[in-house]
Amino acid sequence: MSWFSGLLVPKVDERKTAWGERNGQKRSRRRGTRAGGFCTPRYMSCLRDAEPPSPTPAGPPRCPWQDDAFIRRGGPGKGKELGLRAVALGFEDTEVTTTAGGTAEVAPDAVPRSGRSCWRRLVQVFQSKQFRSAKLERLYQRYFFQMNQSSLTLLMAVLVLLTAVLLAFHAAPARPQPAYVALLACAAALFVGLMVVCNRHSFRQDSMWVVSYVVLGILAAVQVGGALAADPRSPSAGLWCPVFFVYIAYTLLPIRMRAAVLSGLGLSTLHLILAWQLNRGDAFLWKQLGANVLLFLCTNVIGICTHYPAEVSQRQAFQETRGYIQARLHLQHENRQQERLLLSVLPQHVAMEMKEDINTKKEDMMFHKIYIQKHDNVSILFADIEGFTSLASQCTAQELVMTLNELFARFDKLAAENHCLRIKILGDCYYCVSGLPEARADHAHCCVEMGVDMIEAISLVREVTGVNVNMRVGIHSGRVHCGVLGLRKWQFDVWSNDVTLANHMEAGGRAGRIHITRATLQYLNGDYEVEPGRGGERNAYLKEQHIETFLILGASQKRKEEKAMLAKLQRTRANSMEGLMPRWVPDRAFSRTKDSKAFRQMGIDDSSKDNRGTQDALNPEDEVDEFLSRAIDARSIDQLRKDHVRRFLLTFQREDLEKKYSRKVDPRFGAYVACALLVFCFICFIQLLIFPHSTLMLGIYASIFLLLLITVLICAVYSCGSLFPKALQRLSRSIVRSRAHSTAVGIFSVLLVFTSAIANMFTCNHTPIRSCAARMLNLTPADITACHLQQLNYSLGLDAPLCEGTMPTCSFPEYFIGNMLLSLLASSVFLHISSIGKLAMIFVLGLIYLVLLLLGPPATIFDNYDLLLGVHGLASSNETFDGLDCPAAGRVALKYMTPVILLVFALALYLHAQQVESTARLDFLWKLQATGEKEEMEELQAYNRRLLHNILPKDVAAHFLARERRNDELYYQSCECVAVMFASIANFSEFYVELEANNEGVECLRLLNEIIADFDEIISEERFRQLEKIKTIGSTYMAASGLNASTYDQVGRSHITALADYAMRLMEQMKHINEHSFNNFQMKIGLNMGPVVAGVIGARKPQYDIWGNTVNVSSRMDSTGVPDRIQVTTDLYQVLAAKGYQLECRGVVKVKGKGEMTTYFLNGGPSS
C-alpha cells in the first residue's frame, strides 16, 4: 500500500535532502593515503606534537559544472559532521539509524516490510514528533512560534463566538438554566483573557502549551455543561459541539500529536459517557451511541490525517531550511578558507580582477587577457643560497622540505617586517620587491635591511647544520611589470630589464655580502657605507652592460642611531604586548594572515570577525543552530507577509514566486484522496446504522465508492508507477504534479463525500407530521404540539409512519448534519488546496445544504424531528399534558441552528486553511532565500576553486583546505620516478625591449602570455592528463609527470612518454606561433627522469615546487641544449628508445655540477 504511505511518509528528494548524510559516501581511507607504494605524502609539524586528524566536513550538493576531482572528495568523516540529526517522524521512506558516533544516518527502505514493522510504523503516527536534539527541537518550536501565536489568538476569537452561539441557543427558549449560562459566560471571559495573554510581548513557548491545555479544559467543561443542560436530553443532543472541539484539538491548538490524540479521544469518550449515563432509559440509546462512536472515530481520523501531514511538512520544511543554512555556512567557511589561501598566494588586486573576470562572461577576444601592472621606483632583491646542493645531499626529503620551509618562512616574516613582497621561490633562490603593491620612498632601504637580515638568518643555519651555506644578495632599483601569465598554475611574478639586472647582480655577487647597483645606491641617500663591487669581473652580463656595482659595508652612524632608536621602541611595544600576542613560529597558519576587508571585497562576509574565536570553538552543528537562532529572532512574520504575500488571497506578489510555488509537488496527494474515501465509508456506516435502507441509497453509495476508489488508484500509480501501464502513469503524473489538476481532483472528491452525506435526505418520507395529526384530530397544523402526538401514542423512532407514504421515516436528522460536517472537515485533509479555494468550496457546499434544508423537501424531516423530540422529552419525564397546556420546546429548532453551526465550522476550517497555507508559503519563501544564498555561495566557491586550482595542484589545495586544524603541517611527497621538462624560449630576451611604442615592454609580455596560454591549453588536453604544470620562470615553462598515484604508471611508463609527446607538441606549436606572429622564436627543451621531492613551502604564502637532482639535471638539459631541439638524458633515452621513439646521440656535454654527460636528441615519436 505504498500509495497510502504518502500520507504517512514525508517524501524526500535525494538530490536536495536536508539530511547531511545522504549525499556523500564515507571514504574508505583518509586523504593522502595511496594504494601503491611509490609516493606517500606525509604531513608533519616541526612545531607541535602530533594531533589526531581533523575530519573533512561533507560537502553539499554541487552543480555539474563544478564536478572535478577536488570537489568530489569523499563524504562525511566521523566526528563533527555537518549532518542534520534525525527526527522521529513516524512512517517514513527511510529507516533512521544511529551510528557509533551518535549521528543519525538514513538508509533506503528497500526491504519488504513485515507486519510487525508496519504496525510499529502505524503506532509511530500517533506519537509526538520531535527532533533527537533538544536544542534543535527548541529551535523548531521558536521557528513556528509567531505563526502559532497569531493562530492561537484567532482561535480564541472563534471560541468567544462559539460560546456566544451556545449561550444564544440555550437562552433563546423559555427555560434557560442559570448554571449553564454562568458557565458559558465564564468560558467566554476566559477566552477573552487568554486572547489578551497571547498578544503580550512576554508570551513564550511554554506559555503556549499552558494556554492550549487550559483551552482543552474549558472545552471539556462546556461540553459537560451542555450535556447536563440539554432539554430534552438525547444521545445526539449537541453532537456537533464535541465534533468541533475534537477537530480544533487536532488542527488549531499548537499541541503535539500524542496530546491531540488523547484530547480528541478524551472529548469523544466524555460525550459518549455522558450520553450513556443521561439517557439510560432511551429505547434508541445503543443505536445512537453506535453512530456517535463512528462519528467521533471519523472526526479523530480526519484530525490525524490533517495534523500528521501538516506537522511532518512543517518539520520537513524546517529541516530543509536548516539544511540549506547549514550548507551555506559550510560553503561560507570553505570559501573563507579558499579566499585566505588565494589571497596568501596572489596579491589582492590581482585576485579580485581575476575573480571579476570569471564572474563576468567576456566576449571572445583575439588575445587572452593579461593581468599585468607597471610600477616605477621599486627595488628588486635576489638572494641565492650558496652551498645548497651540499645541504640537500645530507638531508632526507622530509628534512629538506622542513629546512626550506622554516628558512623561507623566516624570510617571509623578514620580508613583511621590512615591507617587501615576496615574489617567488625558485629552488634555493628567493626574490622579493619593495614598493609593491603600494609605493614607498624608502624601498631601497627596505631591500638592504632585508638582505642584512637574510644573511644573519642563513648564518644561524650554518651554525646549526655545520654545512658551509651562505647567501648571495643582489639588489637593483628601477621599474617592473608585475602580474601573472598563462591560464594555469598562476604565480605572481615580475618582469623587466631591471629584474634581469637584479638577477645578474645576485649571480655576480659575493657570499655573505649585499651587492647593489648605482641606481640603488642613489636611493640610499648615503645611509650606508659601500665599497666597489666589481661585479663585471664575476658576471659577463654585468660586464657587457657596463654596470657599476657596490658592496654594502655597513650602515652609517646616523643610520645606526635611527635603527637603535627603532629597536628600542619595538622592544617597549613587545614588552607591553607580551602575553597578548603569540610568539612567531616559522610556519604559522596562512589562513589567519589576511585582513577581513579583503575577504569582504572578494565576496565573503567576514562581519563576524569579532566573534571568530567563539565560532571557531563551536562545533559545526552548534554553529548552524546558533546562526538559525539569530535568523529566527530577526525574522518578522508580519513583515514577510507584507513584503511578499497578498493579504487575503495569500498569493505571492511576484508572479515568478507564485509559479515556483505552484510547481511544488505534494507526494501525499494520493493519501488525501484515500482519507476522503475513508470519511465516505464512515458516513455510509453511520447512515446504514441510523437510517432505513433503500435501494436508491445503496446504489448511490456504491457509485460514489467506485468513483473514489478509482481516483485513489489513479493517484496511487504516482507512487508505484512501474507496476501500471504507461498511459495510466502519465495520467497519474499529470494529476499529482499539477497543482490545478490535483486541486480539481481534491474538490471532486470532497463533492462526492458531500453527496453521500446529503443523498439519503431525498430517500426519506417528507410528509409533515403536523398535517397528518391535524387531519386525525380535526385541528389546523399550526395548533399541533408534542402533547397532541403523545395523545396519538406516536413518538420518536417508530417504524410505522403516522402518515401514509411509500418512503421510510428518517427519525434522527441530526446525523445528516453530522455527516455534512464530516464532509466539510474532509476538505481540510487536502492541504495543498488554497485557503481561498477551500473557503469558496465550503461556501458553495454550505449554501446548497442550507437551500435544501430551509427551502427544499428535506426541510420537513427536521420539522418532524423537532416535534417528535418534544414528544420524546415528555415521555422521558413521565408526565402527561393535554394539548392546551403543553410546555414550550426547550431548544432552538434544528434547521435554524444549522446555519449558525455551519458558520462556526466554516470559520474554523478557513482559519486552519489560512494557517496551513500561510505557513507553507512563508516556509517556501524562507527556504527559497536560503537556497539562493547557498547557490550564491556555491558559485563563489566554484570561482574560488577555479582560481585556486590554477595556483596549486588539486591534492595540494585539498590538503590546505581540508586540514585547517593543522595549519603548521608540511606537505611533501617522495616520488621515485618523475619525468621533468624545462622548455625555454632561447631568444626571448632579444625580443624583449622596453620602448614607449610597446608600452615599456608590456606588448612583449602580451605575446609571451599568448605563448604560455597556448602551452597551458595543450597541457589541459585529455591525452596529457598525467602532466602537471609546475611554474613558469620568465620565458621558461616547467612541467612534470607522475607526481601522484593517479598519474604515475610504474609498469607502462606512460607518464614519461606523455611528457615526451608534450615536448614535441610544444615544438610544433612554437612553429605555428612563429608563422602567425612573424617571429623567429627558438625553443630549447630539456627532459630528465628520476626521483624528486614535491611539496609546499611557505605556509604564509604556500608555493608548490619540486626539488632534487632530477630537477637540476633537467634544467641543465635545457640550458645546455640546442635551439629547436629536445635534449634528454641517458635514463630517459633508454625508456623512450624501448617505446620506439626516434632519438639520436648528441655526444658528451659538460654539465655544471655533474661533469660530462652523454645526452640525446628526441627527433620524433614511435614510427607507425
Swiss-Prot record:
A GO molecular-function descriptor: protein kinase C binding
Note on how the cofactor is bound: Binds 2 magnesium ions per subunit. Is also active with manganese (in vitro).
Places the protein is found: Cell membrane; Cell projection, Cilium; Cell projection, Stereocilium
Xref: CDD domains: CHD
Residues exposed to the Extracellular side: 760-819
Activity regulation statement: Activated by G(s) G alpha protein GNAS. Inhibited by G(i) G alpha protein GNAI1. Is further activated by the complex formed by GNB1 and GNG2. Activated by forskolin. Inhibited by calcium ions, already at micromolar concentrations. Inhibited by adenosine, AMP and their analogs. Phosphorylation by RAF1 results in its activation.
GO biological process, one term: renal water homeostasis
Chain positions recorded as Mg(2+) 2 binding sites: D384, I385, D428
Binding of ATP, residues: 384-389, 426-428, 472, 1031, 1105-1107, 1112-1116, 1152
Enzyme Commission number, as recorded: 4.6.1.1
InterPro entries (alphabetical): A/G_cyclase, A/G_cyclase_CS, AC_N, Adcy, Adcy_conserved_dom, Nucleotide_cyclase
Keywords, sorted A to Z: ATP-binding, cAMP biosynthesis, Cell membrane, Cell projection, Cilium, Disease variant, Glycoprotein, Lyase, Magnesium, Manganese, Membrane, Metal-binding, Nucleotide-binding, Phosphoprotein, Repeat, Transmembrane, Transmembrane helix
Cofactor: Mg(2+); Mn(2+)
Keyword Glycoprotein: yes
Residues bearing attached sugar chains per UniProt: N793
UniProt membrane topology term: Multi-pass membrane protein
Residues in compartment: Cytoplasmic: 1-151, 306-673, 914-1168
Transmembrane parts of this sequence: 152-168, 181-197, 214-230, 239-255, 259-275, 289-305, 674-691, 702-718, 743-759, 820-836, 839-855, 897-913
Mutation effect (A674S): No effect on basal enzyme activity, but increased enzyme activity upon activation via G-proteins or forskolin
Disease: Lethal congenital contracture syndrome 8: A form of lethal congenital contracture syndrome, an autosomal recessive disorder characterized by degeneration of anterior horn neurons, extreme skeletal muscle atrophy and congenital non-progressive joint contractures. The contractures can involve the upper or lower limbs and/or the vertebral column, leading to various degrees of flexion or extension limitations evident at birth.
Subunit structure: Part of a complex containing AKAP5, ADCY5, PDE4C and PKD2. Interacts with RAF1. Interacts (via cytoplasmic N-terminus) with GNAS, GNB1 and GNG2.
Protein name, as recorded: Adenylate cyclase type 6
Native source organism of the sequence: Homo sapiens (Human)
Native organism taxonomy: Eukaryota, Metazoa, Chordata, Craniata, Vertebrata
